[in-house]
Amino acid sequence: MDLTEAEDIKKRWQEYTEELYKKDLHDQDNHDGMITHLEPDILECEIKWALESITTNKASGGDGIPEELFQILKDDAVKVLHSVYQQIWKTQQWPQDWKRSVFIPIPKKGNAKKCSNYCTVALISHASKVMLKILQARLQQYINRELPDVQAGFRKGRGTRDQITNIRWIMEKAREFKKNIYFWFIDYAKAFDCVDDNKLWKILKRWEYQTTWSGISISFRIFHSLLWSTQSKALA
């Protein structure tokens, strides 16, 4: 049935996003006590780097603060953000306002009357983006040590061309030695939207315990706080 009333359309989008992003979270691994050592505080130089790395001309999150404001305020913005991030660092908890995001549906090819034919883009606070950029940089140096050499996606300095070269080499060797070779090309529907947070956290915990990840324990706890309490709403 086609929906024509604005309220009905909004309700349908709410139902769709709730189903798409529903979480059955368990094993929250609540930590006792606070970590007060092992990982250095957020530095102002990290904030400056993150601000310079973030793409401009992006829509604001729920707080309505544009990224360009940080560029205008420059050092004053760095000092304010540093004060906020230090508070997050001390409490090891992600701010409640930053746990809320707004989804904007962007139409793709196909029937525009189906919610599944839209790409949902999340609008989050620019201040939270800066903090996430810093946490990502800290975690990335450890993650890169654990990833296998065969993975090229989402890795700096590697890409599709590397994998194409590898595939051609494998095909040539298979032909040379007269061996059968099989390739699987998998396109997951809503791949990023359907990541299992429980499994993601389980993998991260295993890496933390088995490696020298104790040096970023506070980053882990803050990430854990964000992962288990994110809230979203859709704007149709």
Which residues make up each language-model segment?
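Electropositive, glycine- and tryptophan-enriched low-complexity nucleic-acid-binding patches
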Residues: 132-133, 137-154
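Conserved short loop/turn motifs at secondary-structure junctions
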Residues: 35, 65-73, 151-158, 185-191
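Proline-centered turn/helix-capping motifs that create local helix->coil transitions or kinks
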Residues: 25, 93, 139, 143, ...
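Conserved polymerase palm-domain catalytic core
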Residues: 188-236
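Surface-exposed loop/turn segments and immediately adjacent short secondary-structure elements
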Residues: 1-117, 122, 126-130, 147, ...
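Residues that form ligand- and interface-recognition hot spots within folded domains
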Residues: 7, 85, 107, 127, ...
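Conserved catalytic palm subdomain of right-hand nucleotidyl-transferase polymerases, strongest
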Residues: 57-65, 113-123, 161-202
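Short coil/turn segments at secondary-structure boundaries
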Residues: 31-32, 116-118, 136-137, 196-199, ...
